[in-house]
């Protein structure tokens, strides 16, 4: 690796670590207010139901009335075309922003626009509803539970400490800054300072206005423990800048020395060792020994000890200038091309520089962790764009096999084996690495199938790591709808159990060959997830009858129904709402070993961990 590329890779790493953490929140505040615009069809009982929380209970009018003594005089009637303030908890959602997620149950004729702009009086948006819900906006099923996200503010000590209670205020066409300030009894400049980028005359959007408590007084901003936000950011950025200059100096010196030493090394010591990672069942982590590729192994927090650095010219030549004939796939972060490099079949993912976070994340994971059931990273390139070079897997991905047109149906035994292979790969990153890795995008499209119909987990661009002993962390929402568990979709809670939930959905896909979210219904098209379909089937008086209707029809009668039932029961255990009740990947591996080979012996350490799950899969 030359000095230029090494510095680029290092700067990308710093960008990933330091500069992707803006706009984070740590904690919320006890209460915020929502400015609810009343139309003639809306009554107080409707508002209390829509805005139900730990502050406002169902049909609890007194709390709402206590904040609106000047406009609400009677429980039975509201004045149309006025506003009332509704209290709600203001929480830190996923470590990303302040808000609260309400739950709305749909009825016939509902759509996202009606929910956002009528029932929730423009306190949320259609875009937020789409982001936090997996339903097709054009086909929302009746009685579906919709996550309604309303943002809020707890104040800003840099502007004023006199105001700690804020109103989430949706602007309307007749609003102006002067009108709002007069009604609130506040200075226009103060309101503008709290909403520096807001245009109050645009007639739409959300602003935050200091609000009054139940006694009609402005509520002061209580100081929180720790350094003030502005000071903390200033100190942190100054420290980072100083550290950056120092590290770049040391880094440049290091590379100059390594470039001199590299010419003395035999060429074979810098090549990727296929023997170590392609077929061995031995596991290798960051503690493993081995020769470093170039100088990138000296990077703090990023290892490329088993990866080769390719030049752009070499990749372009091998792919015929990244021609369409060589293109074999398109993902969320870039296109994938087939190429033969240095005598080996490869798949090259070409990513934009904007995807530096995902590039570094995947590079870090796949150079740290090697396992038979994880796709093997061969090398990378950082010239022009960002490139990752993987081993080429002959048969594409599981999703193509299950959902593709014209593909041969996978035999049931192969489906069980692929499930076991994938579970082993996930078990390894969950339980045999330090720190622990969480994939965050487990789905059939990210499980590759080799020529022997064995599975390998791929696409680690969204992987998160947590230190051993930390059960959960909070993060921004990424992944694929239909595979997200409730605690992640609603609150951004991340733990290994989100991979377990998604794996349960994959088990359902293996049984049905259906997508995770599909359209169903006889007269009205509606969306339904596989989790819901299997819940209904397994709750029937005769669950086997329900399961037979869900099994991939291409299998005809060539499957053991007992085995299907056991896999469905395992999928159900994986997709429980409470993450604490879901099995670990280790228990899942044991269960699938029992399912794939009932006579196969299991080691004692695995067997004792979830005996009830093993018993579940051993008997009907």
From Swiss-Prot:
It is found in: Cell membrane; Vacuole lumen. Residues 46-72, 102-148, 167-210 form the LysM domain. It is an enzyme of class 2 (transferase). Residues 322-595 form the Protein kinase domain. Autophosphorylated. One of its GO terms (molecular function) is ATP binding. Disruption phenotype: In the lyk3-4 mutant, increased nodulation in plants infected by S.meliloti, mostly resulting in tubular infection threads, and, to a lower extent, in sac-like structures. The weak hcl-4 mutant is unable to form curled root hairs, a step preceding infection thread formation upon infection by S.meliloti and leading to nodulation. In the hcl-2 mutant, S.meliloti induces extensive root hair deformation and continuous curling, but is unable to induce the formation of tight root hair curls and the subsequent infection threads. The modification Phosphoserine is found at residues 269, 273. Expressed in the epidermal and root hair cells of the developing root hair zone during nonsymbiotic growth. Accumulates in roots and nodules during symbiotic growth with rhizobia. Localized at the cell periphery in a narrow zone of about two cell layers (e.g. L1/L2 zone) at the nodule apex upon infection by rhizobia, from the meristem to the infection zone (at protein level). Its EC number is 2.7.11.1. Keywords: ATP-binding, Cell membrane, Disulfide bond, Glycoprotein, Kinase, Membrane, Nodulation, Nucleotide-binding, Phosphoprotein, Receptor, Serine/threonine-protein kinase, Signal, Transferase, Transmembrane, Transmembrane helix, Vacuole. Residues 24-231 are extracellular. The chain crosses the membrane at residues 232-252. The keyword Membrane applies. GO terms for biological process: innate immune response; nodulation; protein autophosphorylation; response to symbiotic bacterium. It catalyses: L-seryl-[protein] + ATP = O-phospho-L-seryl-[protein] + ADP + H(+); L-threonyl-[protein] + ATP = O-phospho-L-threonyl-[protein] + ADP + H(+). Residues 1-23 form the signal peptide. The active site is at residue 441. One of its GO terms (cellular component) is plasma membrane. ATP binds at residues 328-336, 349. Putative receptor for S.meliloti Nod factor signals essential for the establishment of the nitrogen-fixing, root nodule symbiosis with S.meliloti. Involved in the control of root hair curling after S.meliloti infection, probably by modulating the reorganization of the microtubular cytoskeleton in epidermal and cortical cells. Regulates a subset of Nod factor-induced genes. PANTHER family: CHITIN ELICITOR RECEPTOR KINASE 1-RELATED (PTHR46204), LYSM DOMAIN RECEPTOR-LIKE KINASE 3 (PTHR46204:SF15). Belongs to the protein kinase superfamily. Ser/Thr protein kinase family. This is LysM domain receptor-like kinase 3. It comes from Medicago truncatula.
């Amino acid at each position: 690796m030359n000095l230029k590329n090494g510095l680029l890779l290092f700067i990308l790493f710093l960008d990933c670590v330091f500069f992707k953490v803006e706009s984070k929140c740590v904690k919320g505040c006890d209460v915020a207010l929502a400015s609810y615009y009343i139309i003639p069809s809306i009554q107080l009982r409707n508002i209390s139901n829509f805005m139900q929380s730990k502050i406002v209970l169902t049909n609890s009018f007194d709390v709402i009335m206590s904040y609106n003594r000047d406009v609400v005089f009677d429980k039975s009637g509201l004045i149309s075309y006025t506003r009332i303030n509704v209290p709600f908890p203001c929480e830190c959602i996923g470590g990303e922003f302040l808000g609260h997620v309400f739950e709305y149950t749909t009825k016939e004729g509902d759509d996202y626009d009606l929910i956002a702009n009528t029932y929730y009086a423009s306190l949320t948006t259609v875009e937020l509803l789409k982001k936090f819900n997996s339903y097709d906006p054009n086909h929302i099923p009746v009685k579906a539970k919709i996550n309604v996200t309303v943002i809020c503010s707890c104040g800003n000590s840099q502007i004023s400490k006199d105001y700690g209670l804020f109103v989430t205020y949706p602007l309307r066409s007749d609003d102006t800054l002067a009108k709002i300030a007069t009604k609130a009894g506040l200075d226009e400049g103060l309101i503008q300072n709290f909403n520096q980028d807001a245009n109050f005359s645009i007639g739409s959007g959300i602003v935050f206005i200091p609000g009054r408590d139940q006694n009609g007084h402005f509520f002061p901003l209580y100081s929180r423990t720790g350094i003030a936000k502005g000071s903390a950011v200033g100190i942190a950025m100054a420290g980072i800048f100083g550290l950056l200059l120092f590290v770049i100096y040391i880094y440049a010196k290091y590379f100059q020395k390594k470039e001199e030493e590299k010419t003395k090394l035999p060429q074979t010591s810098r090549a990727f060792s296929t023997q170590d990672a392609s077929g061995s069942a031995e596991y290798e982590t960051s503690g493993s020994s081995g020769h470093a590729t170039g100088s990138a192994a000296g990077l703090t927090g990023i290892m490329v000890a088993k990866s080769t650095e390719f030049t752009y010219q070499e990749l372009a030549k091998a792919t015929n200038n990244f021609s369409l004939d060589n293109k074999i796939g398109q993902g969320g972060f870039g296109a994938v091309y087939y190429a033969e490099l240095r005598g080996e079949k490869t798949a090259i993912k070409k990513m934009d520089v904007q995807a530096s976070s995902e590039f570094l994340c995947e590079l870090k994971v796949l150079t740290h962790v090697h396992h038979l059931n994880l796709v093997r990273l061969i090398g990378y390139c950082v010239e022009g764009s960002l490139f990752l070079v993987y081993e080429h897997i002959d048969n594409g991905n599981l999703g193509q096999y299950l959902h593709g047109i014209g593909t041969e149906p996978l035999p049931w035994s192969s489906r069980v084996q692929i499930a076991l292979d994938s579970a082993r790969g996930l078990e390894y990153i969950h339980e045999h690495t330090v720190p622990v890795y969480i994939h965050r995008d487990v789905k059939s499209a990210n499980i590759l199938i080799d020529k022997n119909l064995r599975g390998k987990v791929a696409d680690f661009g969204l992987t998160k790591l947590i230190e051993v002993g930390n059960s959960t962390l909070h993060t921004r929402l990424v992944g694929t709808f239909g595979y997200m568990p409730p605690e992640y979709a609603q609150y951004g809670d991340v733990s290994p159990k989100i991979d377990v939930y998604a794996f349960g959905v994959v088990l359902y896909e293996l049984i049905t060959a259906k997508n995770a979210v599909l359209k169903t219904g006889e007269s009205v098209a509606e969306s339904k997830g596989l989790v819901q379909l299997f819940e209904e089937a397994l709750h029937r008086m005769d669950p086997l009858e329900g399961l037979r209707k869900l099994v991939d029809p291409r299998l005809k009668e060539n499957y053991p129904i007992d085995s299907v039932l056991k896999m469905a029961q395992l999928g159900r255990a994986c997709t429980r709402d409470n993450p604490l009740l879901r099995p670990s990947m280790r228990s899942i591996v044991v269960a699938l070993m029992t399912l794939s080979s009932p006579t196969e012996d299991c080691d004692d350490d695995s067997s004792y961990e979830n005996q009830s799950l093993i018993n579940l899969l051993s008997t009907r």
